[in-house]
Curated annotation (Swiss-Prot):
Domain of life: Bacteria
GO biological process assignments: protein maturation; protein-containing complex assembly
PANTHER family: HYDROGENASE MATURATION FACTOR HYBG
SUPFAM superfamilies: HupF/HypC-like
Signal peptide start-end: none
Entry similarity comment: Belongs to the HupF/HypC family.
Protein's UniProt name: Hydrogenase maturation factor HybG
A single GO molecular function term of this UniProt record: carbon dioxide binding
Length: 82
């Protein structure tokens, strides 16, 4: 099963690779933002994104992020491995 995990954008790169540092349940990881970045990457700072296999797939609001994280925890899904 493929599951996207919510993460919050902490920092964005300024190079061609379109990477951002995203925090997922306390773990920071580099995520490609090319699929969701339509303007200035700095506009994504603080936003919640849905992460799947190293890519930010969509921007979500904080309520949706928290609800998704809660649901994943209830399923005993290992959020940190996503």
């Amino acid at each position: 099963m493929c599951i996207g995990v919510p993460g919050q954008v902490l920092a964005v790169g300024e190079d061609i690779h379109q990477l951002a540092q995203v925090e997922v349940c306390g773990i920071k990881r580099d995520v490609n933002i090319a699929l969701i970045c339509e303007g200035n990457p700095a506009d994504l700072l603080g936003q919640w994104v849905l992460v799947h296999v190293g890519f930010a797939m969509s921007i979500i609001d904080e309520d949706e992020a928290k609800a998704t994280l809660d649901a994943l925890r209830q399923m005993d899904y290992d959020i940190t491995s996503a």
